[in-house]
């Protein structure tokens, strides 16, 4: 009995506390599901919340229509009903939970100075977006998407002398982006950004980070077109439509781009059907494109764990990476090519990773791993599977598993090529080292063909403790059916 009373009193207290710290937009004239603009009501609620030092503004369940950009003020939260991200079922889009309908940012050029365009939601200093769906009602044709600006935008506030007046430190949690053209952009959002529990379906780009510094966290993020299916009336049984949408994403969509960044952590991030999954580049800002301000600190450096890219054309592309810390992947599944460009002077390290390759017939001439002349690729305690299912036996694969012009360090790893009928046996090689490249291969087991490699120019290979096990009916790679 005492335990029951304690629980009851706690529930009453927390409910009362919530009512005090969050102002309800309905008390300011906002009404869901009526087809009318709720911009003025939300603005009034934010102004009053700031006066009362409240925690933020609460949007109850329903469809809320915003025809102007939403600016969440410094230190406040725009809160909906959801306590976790979800697949946006039709009932959710019809008002079972909090759904924000976005009408701003149409026909924006997100690849050139994207910060000049209005976003659906802009988070100011230490502001949070929590527990909502975001949907574009006018993005009606899934096969011909219209460009829109970023759905969620985080940016520092500057004065007239371009000095930082307010650091963003934005947070997006428990939120679903249903049919965004471009998802979340963090530009000069400084320390401590926090993205957690976000599902998104995007047509062009999922997330971009540019000009951030230490200690940002991104976790539990899924980028998958299935979150748009209910909006467009696509069912799981509609295999033809699902495959067509996946093909469209494979041609056009990028998962996450990392530009100027000092340090950050990613955990449990999943990307599927992307042309490019994880991309590492220099800053998008022209004044900072030389990366001179903080030297190599201006280039991306991240620790990425328990994450993956499934059925992507390019799983990882690194053209600029921090030459000190670099980028570290651990416990990752990466189904797609890995490219380290010639402009990459840093290193990518993979520990306990699984790699696979081959999505479309367009890959027949492409290499699974490319290491540019200044780059370093390290793979430890991993498995490399070469099983290009999308490549026919009539047009076999003619690329290399590793094409190295920089440095490759490969150890304690298994190579598997289970279907030798899908590559050209006359040209197949696990490794080619060119230019002044160097590859060390140690404690590696090859399943399928024995270790094949070649060198050109000044390329060198150092191999030791190499094992081989054939693949046959008696020793299959996959269990028998």
Across the structure, where does each feature detected by a protein language model lie?
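Acidic Gly/Asp/Thr-rich repetitive segments characteristic of extracellular carbohydrate-active
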Residues: 25-60, 71
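Feature marks extracellular polysaccharide-active and adherence modules
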Residues: 60, 67, 73, 79-81, ...
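Leucine-rich solenoid repeat scaffolds
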Residues: 431-481
């Amino acid at each position: 009995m005492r335990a029951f009373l304690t629980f009851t009193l706690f529930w009453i207290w927390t409910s009362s506390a919530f009512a005090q710290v969050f102002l309800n937009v309905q008390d300011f004239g906002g009404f869901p599901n009526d087809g009318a603009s709720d911009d003025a009501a939300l603005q009034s609620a934010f102004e009053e919340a700031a006066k009362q030092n409240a925690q933020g503004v609460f949007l109850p369940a329903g469809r809320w229509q915003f025809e102007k950009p939403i600016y969440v003020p410094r230190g406040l939260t725009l809160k909906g009903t959801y306590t976790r991200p979800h697949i946006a079922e039709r009932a959710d889009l019809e008002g079972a939970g909090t759904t924000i309908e976005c009408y701003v940012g149409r026909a924006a050029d997100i690849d050139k100075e994207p910060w000049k365009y209005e976003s659906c939601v802009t988070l100011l200093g230490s502001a949070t977006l929590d527990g909502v769906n975001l949907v574009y009602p006018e993005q009606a044709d899934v096969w011909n998407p219209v460009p829109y600006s970023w759905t969620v935008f985080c940016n520092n506030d500057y004065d007239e002398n371009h000095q930082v007046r307010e650091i963003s430190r934005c947070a997006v949690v428990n939120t679903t982006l249903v049919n965004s053209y471009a998802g979340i952009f963090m530009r000069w959002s400084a320390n401590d950004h926090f993205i957690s529990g976000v599902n998104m379906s995007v047509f062009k780009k999922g997330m971009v980070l540019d000009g951030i510094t230490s200690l940002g966290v991104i976790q539990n993020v899924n980028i998958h077109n299935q979150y748009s299916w209910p909006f467009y009336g696509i069912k799981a049984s509609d295999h033809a439509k699902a495959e067509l949408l996946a093909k469209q994403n494979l041609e056009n969509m990028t998962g996450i781009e990392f530009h100027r960044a000092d340090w950050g952590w990613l955990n449990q991030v999943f990307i599927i059907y992307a042309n490019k999954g994880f991309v590492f580049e220099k800053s998008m800002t022209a004044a900072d494109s030389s990366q001179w301000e903080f030297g190599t600190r201006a280039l991306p450096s991240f620790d990425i764990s328990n994450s993956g890219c499934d059925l992507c054309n390019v799983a990882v592309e690194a053209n600029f990476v921090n030459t000190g810390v670099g980028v570290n992947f651990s416990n990752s599944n990466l189904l797609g090519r890995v490219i380290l460009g010639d402009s990459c002077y840093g290193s990518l390290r993979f520990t306990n990773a699984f790699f696979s390759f081959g999505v479309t017939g367009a890959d027949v001439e492409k290499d699974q791993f490319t290491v540019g002349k200044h780059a370093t690729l390290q793979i430890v305690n991993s498995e490399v599977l070469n099983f290009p299912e999308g490549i026919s036996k009539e047009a076999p694969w003619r690329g290399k598993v590793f094409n190295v012009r920089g440095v490759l360090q490969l150890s304690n790893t298994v190579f598997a090529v289970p279907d030798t009928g899908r590559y050209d046996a006359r040209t197949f090689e696990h490794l080619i080292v060119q230019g002044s490249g160097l590859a060390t291969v140690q404690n590696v087991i090859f399943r399928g063909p024995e270790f094949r490699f070649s060198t050109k120019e000044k390329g060198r290979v150092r191999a030791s403790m190499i094992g081989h096990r054939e693949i046959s009916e008696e020793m299959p790679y996959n269990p028998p059916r």
